[in-house]
Amino acid sequence: MRILKYLFLLLFLFLIGTSVFVSTQKGDYDVTRSIVIKNPRNTVFNYINDFRNWETFCSWIKNDNTYKFNYPELTMGQGASCSWVSSGTEGNLKTVSVKENESISQKMVNNEETSTIYWNFKDTIGGTKVTWRSKGKLDFKSKVAAFFHGGINSVVGDEYEKSLENLNKTLDYEINTYSVKVNGIVNRPGGFYLKQFLHCKQKDVDRNIKILVSRMEHFFDKNKMSSNGKPFIIYHKYDRTKDDIGFSVCMPVRDSIHIMPGSDIESGKLASYTSLKTTLTGDYSHTQTAWKKALTYSTDNHLERNNSGQIVEVYAVGRNDVKNPSKWVTEIYIPVFPKSVPKPVNRRSLDSLVVATPPTESTTP
């Protein structure tokens, strides 16, 4: 019994000593981890810049299926944000500033603890050097938890290392794995839709499409509207010489919807037309490759473009359907005139056709 009392006393003294020691330790932390990723800098930057992609590489999210994310209208660029709840945490993340292809600064609140996150991107031999840094201050409870797990630098640093490795694998496979198939001539059905129009430079097309698609989906959710299919893009102008691209991000609807004047959302109707269909399976960054293959097929098969039709990209399978970019499906429809089909020959006419027998040449002796 006396031994048991001594054990309890030792345990009590240990807990008191640990508490005093932990409480005197600085709660400030500054953790940095880096990795070289074998992808172009703009590809890596754009992927990290969009909060919707974080579920594919953050180790603490991938290892906990209780995480539920909420994504607002803007999820990439300055002012972007997201929030989450899980069995043990609740928090939000916001992008404070962005320097295109160079750096991202963010503020995170997790279980009422605030931290600052910095991302830096630099070209290097073999790809892009990505540096992930986090600064913050721990409360007493978090300091105790960190103490028993090797310290905050070890806890956060290990998670960052695992996440950066996940990011490297994700970008290496998910971004670089794709296929393009020219399906051939099809009839593209028409229908009603709501759209938002934008002009921009070619280098900004992909980023702006992501932003506008997210806004359109948010508009439908906010107004409790149902779409009649997948979002699609109509290209009105594609002037490479002047670097001027005009397009509309569209969401199909079952019936015509009246939109009040002054709104940046408009309604429209797409007529059905004959088109050359090409399917891209993979990340949107390979869209230009799919376009080139479609145009080459069109030229090789002497297809005539129908300029009265609309060039359309349909996001048949997107990020809301599956997180893996390698499984996304984009359908491209280029309007063309139907190829003329030779008129079938009437077999009866052939059978009854009288062929004149050529005269036999004769000679007079």
Give the predicted meaning of each segment.
Residues 36, 96-97, 122:
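Well-ordered beta-strand positions
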Residues 32-34, 90-92, 105, 114-118, ...:
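Well-ordered beta-strand positions in beta-sheet-rich domains
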Residues 41, 102-103, 127:
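Structural motif
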Residues 3-9, 53-57, 65-112, 222-223, ...:
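Glycine-rich portal/gate segments that line the openings of hydrophobic small-molecule binding cavities
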Residues 1-31, 86-91, 138-153, 217-225:
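An N-terminal domain-start capping segment
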Residues 2-69, 215, 297, 332:
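Hydrophobic ligand-binding cavity/cleft-lining segments
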Residues 43-54, 82, 95, 130, ...:
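Hydrophobic pocket/interface hotspot
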Residues 19, 65, 109, 114-365:
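A solvent-exposed interaction/effector surface
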